Amino acid sequence: RVWLKEGIKVTNLHPDDGSAIQASNLFTDLIYYLLTDKRGGIGETLARTDADLDKLIDKDQLSETAKFLRKNKLFCNGAISQPENVRSWLSEKAPVFLCDFILSDGRFSVKPALPVTDGGDINHTGAVTIKQIFTSGNILEDSFKLDYLEAEERNLFKATVRYRVERENQLPGEATVTVRSGEGDGEVPTETFDVTDLCTSRDHAVLIGKYMVTLRKRITHTCTFSTTPYGLDLAPGDYIRVITESSPYSAVRTGTIAADGTITLATSIEDGDYKIIYYATSTDDADAEVVTIDVSNGIAQDWSDSGRGAAIFSLVETLTSENVYRVEQLTLNQENIVEISASEFPCDNGSVSLIAKDIKDRDLFDVF
């Protein structure tokens, strides 16, 4: 090993750097180098000309992300010492810098995994920008699915982050920092994150620990659904609001109605109008029907006159769920239908990211 003060000279994409060709410690500049350089990267394989390369890389987004990295001091210091699959390597390392490596509109880029201000700081006070709202009106029928994380994937933990310590003209050392949520009794397992290959700052390591702990605490599920491409203006990393309605089964809301309208239910039922789904037990017809009944003194009015006879019923209770999600992937299938995959992105009532608020709350974590 040798100690090098600076690395290779690359194009600097931060707006303040004016595309200077010089050493850099920003992950975005490394990405651009690996994707475009024809000797040290895959530029020769990716495209034949520089003009073609520019069409495959979103430099504007890289420039915006560079502001986020520098503002939060998420610096990239390390070496790629062995052959790597560039796309896999970048996807694996992006979370070290609180980012996601994305492919949007056929162009490669990297985007912060958190909402950011125009200046690049983590936005923990302003509402996230909702690009589109999805309801039963634009979600194709029977396509919406929720996938909850396994129980072991939702257990809280304390993060021990290993990072590299550099001293001029000396061999590198190693240090660790542990981050734990201040909530609870502290009796949680430890998960270790080794970022010694790229991280040389304790503050950077602490931010990684806070991010990983908060993700485990806040995110519980992902969703997938299908929609039509018409009017769709989305890309990976965008935020969407999904509003769904459901009528979950409840045993205490299920009962019987006699032919004369007398209601038998596990709990008392107040007078008023109720929407029910029922199966008539007096006929061989197994189809369910939905009707509204007027209940007075525990009797469904006009039930006996309807000729429906005795029935089993369940009160229909419609629950509305409204959540913010972060788009992970969009796929256009052969039927010209767009399939969207997104992960839960918890926000408060003002649409402010709870993950961002947690990370910026100094009193929420114990660091040692």
Regions found by a protein language model. Give the residues of each.
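C-terminal extracytoplasmic interaction modules
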Residues: 13-368
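Structured beta-strand-rich cores of soluble
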Residues: 1-19
